[in-house]
Amino acid sequence: MSYELIAAKRVDLGTGASRRLRRAGKLPAVVYGAGKDAVSLELDHNTLYHAVKHADFHTSVLELVIDGQKEQVKVAAFQMHPYKQQVLHIDFARV
């Protein structure tokens, strides 16, 4: 199964900005690696929450569309809330 995720670059960074994103149904994320600078992103939470449940999501090469530009990435790490059904943050590594 192939995954295509739509993301947008984040302007506001930090704890408060991340909390505001989560309240708005978004998910803070970062993509890094391949000799390029790290880019802070925001994604739709529900899309990622349902994708994280599938084992192949964690091992597949994903297509991440950042403001119209496509990048090949893999999931490097993600954080779940201790008791809520909520993804808190996800890291992607460029392939």
From Swiss-Prot:
SUPFAM superfamilies in UniProt: Ribosomal protein L25-like
Similarity remark: Belongs to the bacterial ribosomal protein bL25 family.
NCBIfam families on file: bL25_bact_ctc, PRK05943.1
Pfam families for the chain: Ribosomal_L25p
InterPro entries in the cross-refs: Rbsml_bL25/Gln-tRNA_synth_N, Ribosomal_bL25/Gln-tRNA_synth, Ribosomal_bL25_long, Ribosomal_bL25_short, Ribosomal_L25_dom, Ribosomal_uL5_bac-type
Keywords from the named record: Ribonucleoprotein, Ribosomal protein, RNA-binding, rRNA-binding
Gene that specifies this protein: rplY
Known role: This is one of the proteins that binds to the 5S RNA in the ribosome where it forms part of the central protuberance.
The protein's name in its UniProt record: Large ribosomal subunit protein bL25
Any one of the GO BP annotations: translation
One MF term in the entry's GO annotations: structural constituent of ribosome
Cellular component terms (Gene Ontology): cytosolic large ribosomal subunit
Organism: Chromobacterium violaceum (strain ATCC 12472 / DSM 30191 / JCM 1249 / CCUG 213 / NBRC 12614 / NCIMB 9131 / NCTC 9757 / MK)
Subunit-structure text: Part of the 50S ribosomal subunit; part of the 5S rRNA/L5/L18/L25 subcomplex. Contacts the 5S rRNA. Binds to the 5S rRNA independently of L5 and L18.
